[in-house]
């Protein structure tokens, strides 16, 4: 009788629990940041002024969301967090005895998962392996394969359970890393194509892990970018359309805000960059017929700029903020003239030519390629500080020297100017290749293409005829020292490591050098980053008067000069 009573009570309890679960509805909120690029604190350490957005305001927003959702809030970061501000550089390479500030921020805000971005890989094993160890949450990368074990280098996915709902987060990175970065930065790794990788792991998540919700967290843009026979740089759209089983995909890398739901029901979100906005998915689940089903799903892009700064957050990180301020406020030298990145789009300009000087002096090359890495900044006459080094040179690239023929040099420049300038058919046409589409990545602002691929050359004199069709605009006249320039001769060409490894595809699609041949063309790689040598150069010179080389120009001048004035006013509101 006692045993029967116990069984009856157990069955009654099970029925009550089942009935309760049957009627249960759970609402989850998932928030993503992406491409934060060191925007941790409400101060721009490059421009030395207050900064919009930043994780200090994200923190305020998260506090409110945690009060409302508690453990039903899931917080994800989508990579490219280790480069972008002096904050990162200081933590990555200067003050290395302390935890990486990027790890400290992620830990303080209690993120559930992180993924790799290409700029995180660019910091090198010493930096990112330390960062991974210091994180309290897992770093995900299902398609980043350890070449020794054949298994993912980091965790492929994360399983979470919230109020009985099983949630899987699958992380992936764009496989185009070899197109930008030298293998010494990702030694022991290879990068799988995203569609096949996603298909394999979603099957595992649904069948073995019994996930009720599957979330993608991809450091890969929506569509486009580099496309090869083996992979696509920006493959999020392709994965969302072709791989069955995703409910939500958070993505980034392309610095372009996105919120859409595909015909197959997959919600796709991208918050753009610099912690200006966050991507947010709200998912309502109900327990129906013995399993959890999504009954409502909504995506939003939330503007963070109107949030107040979280003073508790700032107070917690005040020692780091003070140290970074001290670092960027170091005087380096004196500029006798001002120079602006704006000038670099309209002809030979000191802002770019000073980097050309550095590359030619450092390598002894015949020719130098360089593009403006900041879209709209100025280094003013007077004392130059460490912060200005990040204006002059934004990224931690090395200096490379490659062997190229004269023909390859011209073809490289042809592609650069194809991306850069319009083909003018009348004197009233635009000279710049512009678009009506609005970009918020601070790197285009009216231009159709990314301006960090607008390479000019030093060491040679040349003209760019804006009335000629693409591929026929560049006419190289001579070397700047008077030597003849020959298309069939081999020359030494200095450039940054991003370009030398294939970044922007100017060497591959432009110059026509096969991607797998690029390593054999490299004859020099600097041991330190370019900004280090730039800082040394200015310290050595003391008083610096940067000058334009005046070695190239747009022609015909009677069309080009008025068009430059019009487009400059249009782009920069001058």
Predicted segments, located by residue:
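Alpha-helical transmembrane segments and their juxtamembrane interfaces
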Residues: 12-13, 45, 90, 415
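Intrinsically disordered, low-complexity peptide-like regions
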Residues: 3-5, 13, 75, 245, ...
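Residue-level recognition of short, structured coil/turn motifs
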Residues: 6-9, 70, 210, 364
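Catalytic centers of hydrolytic enzymes
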Residues: 24-29, 33, 39-48, 53-64, ...
């Amino acid at each position: 009788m006692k045993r029967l009573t116990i069984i009856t009570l157990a069955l009654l309890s099970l029925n009550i629990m089942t009935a309760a679960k049957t009627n249960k509805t759970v609402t989850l909120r998932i928030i993503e940041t992406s491409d934060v690029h060191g925007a941790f604190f409400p101060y721009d350490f490059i421009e030395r002024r207050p900064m919009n957005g930043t994780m200090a305001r994200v923190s305020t927003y998260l506090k409110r969301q945690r009060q409302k959702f508690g453990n039903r809030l899931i917080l994800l970061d989508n990579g490219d967090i280790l480069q972008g501000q002096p904050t990162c550089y200081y933590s990555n390479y200067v003050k290395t005895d302390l935890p990486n500030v990027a790890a400290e921020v992620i830990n303080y805000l209690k993120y559930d998962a992180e993924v790799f971005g290409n700029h995180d890989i660019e910091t090198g094993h010493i930096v990112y392996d330390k960062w991974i160890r210091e994180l309290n949450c897992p770093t995900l990368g299902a398609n980043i394969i350890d070449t020794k074990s054949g298994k993912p280098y980091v965790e492929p996915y994360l399983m979470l359970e919230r109020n009985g709902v099983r949630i899987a987060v699958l992380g992936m990175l764009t496989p185009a890393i070899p197109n930008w970065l030298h293998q010494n930065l990702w030694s022991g790794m290879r990068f799988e194509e995203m569609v096949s990788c996603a298909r394999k792991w979603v099957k595992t998540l649904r069948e073995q892990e019994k996930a009720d919700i599957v979330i993608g967290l991809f450091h890969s843009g929506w569509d486009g970018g580099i496309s090869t026979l083996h992979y696509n740089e920006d493959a999020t759209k392709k994965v969302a359309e072709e791989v069955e089983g995703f409910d939500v995909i958070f993505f980034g890398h392309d610095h372009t805000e996105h919120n859409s739901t595909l015909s197959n029901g997959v919600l796709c979100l991208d918050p753009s960059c610099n912690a200006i906005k966050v991507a947010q998915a709200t998912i309502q689940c109900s327990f129906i017929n013995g399993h959890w089903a999504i009954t409502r799903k909504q995506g939003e892009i939330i503007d963070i700029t109107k949030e107040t700064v979280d003073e508790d957050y700032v107070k917690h990180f005040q020692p780091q903020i003070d140290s970074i301020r001290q670092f960027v406020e170091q005087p380096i030298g004196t500029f006798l003239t001002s120079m602006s990145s704006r000038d670099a789009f309209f002809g030979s300009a000191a802002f770019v030519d000073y980097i050309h000087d550095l590359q030619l002096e450092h390598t002894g090359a015949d020719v130098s390629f360089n593009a403006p890495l900041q879209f709209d900044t100025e280094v003013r006459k007077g004392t130059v500080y460490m912060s200005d080094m990040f204006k002059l040179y934004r990224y931690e690239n090395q200096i490379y020297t490659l062997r190229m023929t004269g023909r390859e040099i011209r073809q490289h420049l042809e592609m650069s100017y194809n991306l850069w300038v319009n083909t003018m058919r009348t004197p009233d046409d635009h000279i710049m290749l512009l678009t009506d589409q609005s970009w918020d990545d601070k790197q285009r602002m009216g231009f159709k293409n990314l301006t960090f691929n607008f390479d000019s050359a030093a060491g040679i004199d040349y003209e760019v005829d804006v009335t000629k069709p693409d591929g026929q605009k560049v006419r190289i006249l001579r070397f700047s020292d008077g030597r003849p320039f020959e298309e069939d001769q081999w020359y030494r060409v200095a450039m940054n490591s991003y370009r030398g490894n294939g970044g922007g595809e100017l060497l591959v699609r432009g110059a026509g050098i096969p991607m797998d041949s690029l390593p054999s063309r490299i004859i020099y790689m600097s041991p330190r980053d370019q900004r280090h040598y730039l800082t040394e150069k200015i310290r050595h010179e003391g008083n610096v008067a940067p000058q334009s080389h005046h070695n190239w120009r747009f022609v015909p001048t009677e069309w080009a000069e008025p068009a430059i004035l019009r487009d400059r006013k249009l782009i920069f509101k001058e």
